[in-house]
Amino acid sequence: MGLGKTLQLLALEVTERVEPAGPSLLLCPMSLVGNWQAEARKFAPDLRVYAHHGPQRLRGQDLTDQLARTDIVVTTYGTATRDLDELAEIDWNRVVLDEAQAIKNRHSRTAKAVGRLRGEHRVALTGTPVENRLGELWSIMDFLNPGLLGSAEKFRTRYAIPVERH
C-alpha cells in the first residue's frame, strides 16, 4: 500500500494510449475494484473504465460492444478465471495483474488462467514479489516474459535452491 502502483499504471495507460489500441484488462482482488474505479475517476478522468464482475456482468455481444467503448476493464482474479474462455479470446492492449503475488503458485488455477490471457503488453504490480520462496518470483516473471527464466525446474535448480540455502 502507498507505493504509487495504481497511479503509475494509470499514468502509463493515459500516456501510452494510442488508437486503435484495444482495452487493457486489469485483474485485482475484489477489495480493490472500487479503488481502481475511484482512482481512475480522480487521476485519469478521460479513461473509460468498466468493472467486469458480479452476476450482472456483460457477456457475449454485450461485452464486445462495451469493450469498444472502454479503455480499462477491471475485474477480479476469480471472475477472470470463471470467464476465461471468453476473456482469453480477446486481444488486450495490456494485461495487468495488481497484487500479482496472487499467481505465485504456478500450479494454481488462477496462475494457469492468467497465462492464457493475450495481451500486447503485460504488467505485474506487487509490493511483495517474494514472500516465502524464490520460486514465487519465477511464476510472476513467467507471466511477464514466458520462458525467459527457463522452466520452473531449471530455475529452481539453478537459482532457488542455491539462494535459499544461504
Show where each model-derived region lies:
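ASCE P-loop NTPase motor core, strongest for the SF2 helicase catalytic module
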Residues: 1-166
